A protein has these predicted regions:
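Accessory DNA-engaging acidic/polar modules
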Residues: 1-66
Length: 66
């Protein structure tokens, strides 16, 4: 998943090795096309939000280990 988002030029923050999430940083309107494709392609789930990991910037996150 990480490589997919990086390949389309989206900032990725990966905290899964410390029990966190994989964050995709961006406004929902800008990243939803890629998120929807990843959800379908990799059969993952996640949610939109903002958190400490992103410096409280908007994005989408998943706990998937794919």
């Amino acid at each position: 998943i990480k490589e997919y988002f990086e390949s389309v030029g989206i900032e990725v923050i990966d905290k899964r090795d410390r029990g966190g999430c994989l964050w995709i940083v961006g406004e929902r309107t800008d990243i939803s096309k890629y998120v929807n494709e990843a959800v379908t392609r990799f059969k993952i789930s996640g949610a939109y939000g903002a958190g400490h990991a992103t410096g409280h910037r908007n994005g989408w996150y998943t706990k998937s280990n794919k």
